[in-house]
Amino acid sequence: MNHLTIVTYHYVRPIKGSKFPGIRGLELEGFRRQLDYLDKNYTIIGTEQVIDASRNGSKLPAKACWLTFDDGYADHSKFVLPELLKRNLHGAFFPPKVAIEDTVVLEANLVHHILSCVDDVKQLVFKLNSCCRSSGIADSEIGSHYNEYAVPNRFDNAETVYVKRMLQHVLPPELRLSISRDFFDEFVGVSVADFSDELYMSVDEVRDLVKSGMYVGSHGSRHYPLDKISSGEQQKDIQQSLNFLEHVGAPTKDWVMCYPYGAYNDVTLSLVKKHGASLGITIDFGVANFEADNLFALPRLDTNDFPQ
């Protein structure tokens, strides 16, 4: 069987001594230990081998493992790249265009850092619901949202999941961005522009990943859940992300799509195939099976699923 263990990473940094010790990420020392573990127990392969398996059906080595890094964080150039190069390992990086080229902070990152700076998430839920109420949302609708979305998962408690869902997907875009920015100002207390410059890689740093032999693929342009936007908007977003890849010197033939939030629909799959993608990766839980899975919707495991 052609199985592939795809590992997902986001924040990788010395967290305890950082400005945001409450952020949910992987400590640098834990990353080093995890690389040692994976290198010993798996065969870490490069993206070219993954693409060859998807395009040509070539066999993957036993216990093949592929390291993937989402969202374009400065952590990836500052901390991850040196560790990979030191071990002669390969990684695949998926930065969204706007995070690298524009002075913005992705909605998800606003929410992550708000949560990292809040002592009591239940109080944050209370404030969020008050903001919704002030915006004209009825108590019955708020209660319905809470009942539907306040469900714990393997990473977060119920209240945290509720805040993430409401501020990343459920509320209307303008309202959720307004609330997130107000909460960011209140709890994080730094300017969005300065925060963006510090959080994400620069264009030159992404180019350095490519020059260092790493793979850079698409994570969309605006980091939107693609299944929530029209086919025309999806087309535009995917094309802009490919233009960005070309701009940083990354391949745009047989490229890899990493869906923002793991979200896609049939239109998305059709578009990425039309634009020449070789495969797509999601946030669905599991080890990828190249003989049975949809190659444009492969599952991944999380760094938290392995020793650190």
Regions found by a protein language model. Name each.
Residues 1-68, 75, 106-115, 211, ...:
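C-terminal active-site subregion of NodB/CE4 polysaccharide deacetylases
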Residues 7, 13, 64, 85-263, ...:
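Metal-dependent polysaccharide deacetylase catalytic core of the NodB/CE4 family, i.e.
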Residues 70-72, 77, 87, 92:
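Conserved beta-strand->loop/alpha-helix structural units within folded catalytic cores of enzymes
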